[in-house]
Structure formats: structure tokens, C-alpha cells
């Protein structure tokens, strides 16, 4: 199946249309993904905190969405020198800017959901980050996820490495070098 990606920024002057698109989205597996999309993505877009992209299938259904942002990271001493170097380029540099895939959500209300894999969605998001890297540089991509076995296995299968262990209710952090993706 073919997919087209569009920015919600292209529809900001028609919030009624966006609200109609939002109504077609359901992610029962993670209500936070659905909540961000429906309640925060427009505001984050307007404030330039992030960019949200819609993935539309050839039947003009919303297949999923992803949100990209930049994040300032402080790599504490618990992060290995190898991972610190992957993120910042230097094993002794504690601060770094990193690309963030802040949201990644499939639309389970789409009748063709089984034909659209999470791997396809993350690959589309990574393609956009690669374009940004060509323009402004950058070394790595960060994702954060809940401590759920399926999520952890998904990101590890995609080549991400766990950056730090979870403490309390904090999200798990995974990174991948952009060099590894080329």
C-alpha cells in the first residue's frame, strides 16, 4: 500500500478539518498517544515545540501519525561513555541536542491497520529526520517509552539502544545513531 505524509501545519487555518481528522483516530493501546494527537498537537505546532505529520493511506484514511522535535539532553554519569559518544560525539561531553520522535501512533480505527506496520511508521519518521540532518547536522535520535515489553522489543528491533535504566515512573529512553541508519 502507498502512503502520503502531510504536516498538520498545512491545515492550521482549517482547524475544523483537523478536528475531523482527529475524530477518525483511535489508539486504544495507548491513550497518551491518542490524547496528545487530539488535544495537544495543534498547540505544540503553533508554538513551534514540535512538528506533527499525518500518514495517509491510498484510500485517504489516516494510517498513523508521528511528532518530531529537538531535545536538549544532559547525559548524567550513569550513561556509559560509549552511549555518550554516540549521542554527543564526545565521551566527556554531558550536554547534547538530539532529535526526538516524541509521538508515534498507528490508527487502530483504520480498516487497513494490519497492512501498516510500526516499522513503516518509524521509517517514515526517520526519513524526515534524515532530511533535517542533511540541513542542520545532528548525531542521534531519541525515543521515550513506557516500560512495556512489546515497546522495548520494537525499539530494540529497530536498532535503538537503551540509554538509561528506568527509575520510578520515568519513561525508558532509547537512542540510535543517525550514522547507523545510513
Feature-to-residue mapping (PLM):
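Non-catalytic substrate-recognition and accessory regions of acyl/acetyltransferase enzymes
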Residues: 1-113, 120, 124-142, 146, ...
Amino acid at each position: 500500500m502507498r502512503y502520503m505524509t502531510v504536516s498538520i501545519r498545512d491545515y492550521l487555518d482549517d482547524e475544523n478539518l483537523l478536528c475531523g481528522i482527529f475524530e477518525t483516530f483511535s489508539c486504544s493501546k495507548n491513550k497518551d498517544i491518542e490524547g496528545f494527537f487530539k488535544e495537544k498537537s495543534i498547540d505544540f505546532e503553533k508554538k513551534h515545540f514540535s512538528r506533527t505529520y499525518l500518514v495517509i493511506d491510498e484510500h485517504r484514511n489516516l494510517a498513523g501519525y508521528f511528532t518530531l522535535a529537538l531535545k536538549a539532553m544532559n547525559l548524567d554519569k550513569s550513561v556509559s561513555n560509549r552511549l555518550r559518544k554516540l549521542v554527543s560525539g564526545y565521551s566527556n561531553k554531558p550536554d547534547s541536542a538530539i532529535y526526538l520522535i516524541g509521538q508515534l501512533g498507528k490508527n487502530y480505527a483504520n480498516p487497513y491497520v494490519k497492512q501498516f506496520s510500526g516499522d513503516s511508521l518509524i521509517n517514515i519518521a526517520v526519513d524526515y529526520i534524515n532530511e533535517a540532518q542533511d540541513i542542520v547536522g545532528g548525531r542521534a535520535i531519541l525515543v521515550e517509552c513506557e516500560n512495556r515489553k512489546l515497546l522495548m522489543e520494537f525499539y530494540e528491533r529497530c536498532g535503538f539502544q537503551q540509554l538509561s535504566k528506568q527509575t520510578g515512573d520515568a519513561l525508558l529512553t532509547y537512542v540510535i545513531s543517525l550514522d547507523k541508519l545510513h
